[in-house]
From Swiss-Prot:
Gene Ontology process terms (BP): glutamine transport; L-glutamine import across plasma membrane
Record key words, sorted: Amino-acid transport, ATP-binding, Cell inner membrane, Cell membrane, Membrane, Nucleotide-binding, Transport
PROSITE patterns in UniProt: ABC_TRANSPORTER_1, ABC_TRANSPORTER_2
Keyword match Oxidoreductase: no
Name this polypeptide is given: Glutamine transport ATP-binding protein GlnQ
Domain ABC transporter, residue spans: 2-236
GO molecular function: ABC-type amino acid transporter activity; ATP binding; ATP hydrolysis activity; L-glutamine transmembrane transporter activity
Chain's gene name: glnQ
Entry binding sites for ATP: 34-41
Entry's induction text: By lack of glutamine.
Amino acid sequence: MIEFKNVSKHFGPTQVLHNIDLNIAQGEVVVIIGPSGSGKSTLLRCINKLEEITSGDLIVDGLKVNDPKVDERLIRQEAGMVFQQFYLFPHLTALENVMFGPLRVRGANKEEAEKLARELLAKVGLAERAHHYPSELSGGQQQRVAIARALAVKPKMMLFDEPTSALDPELRHEVLKVMQDLAEEGMTMVIVTHEIGFAEKVASRLIFIDKGRIAEDGNPQVLIKNPPSQRLQEFLQHVS
């Protein structure tokens, strides 16, 4: 479903991804960890073309992301994304935020979009907050609206870029619960996070990126309980 073939990425003279080879299959829940500046968020953002790769090939659901003829909007319909900051429209209610994608991207009529939006708000536990504005919601509630909004365009995969790092500790669990539910439903997910407990419990695969390279790739329970390298062991001790 997602295939990196010898992918590198530069920002000016600085190389942030080095010759990445990676395959992610449908239904996998892949958690990517690594220190700040390691390239993990850049890798994630390349998947739906928020960042352009410098060399190599990147295939997402049969679409060659680095082909200039491929419409980036088509890629982003297939790969929903949730960011560290919620990026909700402040002048729209929770319901209207979730309706936005079906109306503008999928061309749904208003009745269809509202029905879907209400279903998704219920799915993330916010049916009773449908008519609240973002300023009236907690950070955890805003992030759950953001997840519902990403799901509203019916993507084939979901990308999460540190979705809990801006939240107070007591609010993180409600977002992680929604993500766990999605994983159990079989959604293909690629998640950049420092939530090691979540990775161990929910992920089917754990990738450790260091200095722009994939340093470890394997079973989360094995890598977390018995780190095969000193570098991973040091990182896990730092974030635990």
